[in-house]
Each structure stands twice: as C-alpha cells, then as structure tokens.
Amino acid sequence: ELLSRIRQLVGPAMPIVASLDLHANVTQRMLAQSDALVSYRTYPHIDMADTGELAAQLMQRRLKLGRKEPMFSRRFPFLISLNAQSTWMAPAKSAYEQLLALDRESGVMLSFCMGFPASDFEECGPVVWGHGPQAEAVVEQLFKAVSEPSVWRPHWLPARDAVVRSEEH
C-alpha cells in the first residue's frame, strides 16, 4: 500500500527504490510499483547500512539505465517458520551464502524475503527476486537451490530432551 501511494504522488517517471525487512511479505504490487527493491540479508538484522548501500546501488543503476531494470521473482508455495529464518545457522545461512555467490557471479542484485508467516493474506510467504539483465535465469537458479520445503522444517527437541540438553551446557 505504501509504495502504491508514493507512486501515485510522484508519478511513473520518478524512480522508487526501497529496502525491505528480511521478513517482509513481498507482493506483486510492491514489485510493480517500485523501480527496485532490496531486502536485508541477515536475521538478526545487522546489515541495515549494507542494505542501504545496496539500495543506493540499485538507484544508481536505475538512473544510469534511464528506465527500470529487468526484474524477475518467484514465490515459494509454502511458509517458512520464523524459527528457521536465522541466517546464523542452516538452512537460512546456506541460502544466503548461495544468494551472495550468485549475486557476485552474475551482477544480478538478488533478494530473498522469507516472509512473516503469522500474517494472514494471500501473498504471505517467501519470495526471491532479482534485478538485472539475467534476472530470470539467476532467480530460477536460486529458487531451485533454496525452495525445497523439507529443508525449512525446524527440528524441535522433545521437552525432556531439551531440558537434558540445557543442563549439559
């Protein structure tokens, strides 16, 4: 809604680039109303300044090109528990390592929002997207690498085992 209202105010010629929380539920409307979006790549969120730099790079690319860069996105057909979203451990850690490697290799600016699963609306859930000439191929590559549902299922210890384990440490 916010990006749509900004777009209404500034018109189609004014570039709009925004940064998003890693847990954002990214909608097709958000992608359509902006010239570019980039998400945080860490949870806990320790990359605010880095994400601002990425947004500035996207704006610079947009201004240099004189139009919106090609963008492609893929939505996951499942939700990711918040407990599986920490980028300090698997599976999110390896997902973002793959994102960074593809980002560097391809020049496509990639983002992966894992979504906020407690939201209740149709477009709630994880989305990967990218900006750049090879966006479709690179997004498809990342999507295939990180979209296996079984990888994202958190492992829960039974209560008794959790107590025993906590006493050991």
Regions found by a protein language model. Name each.
Residues G52-A56, Q60-R104:
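Conserved anion/nucleotide-ligand pocket segment
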Residues S34-V38, R74-F78, F121-P126:
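Short acidic (Asp/Glu) and glycine-rich catalytic loops that position anionic groups and cofactors
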Residues A92-D161:
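C-terminal accessory domains and tails appended to enzymatic cores
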Residues Y43-T51, N83-P91, D120, H131-V138:
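Catalytic cores of large soluble enzymes that bind and process phosphate-bearing ligands
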Residues E168-H169:
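Conserved small/polar residues in nucleotide/adenosyl-binding loops
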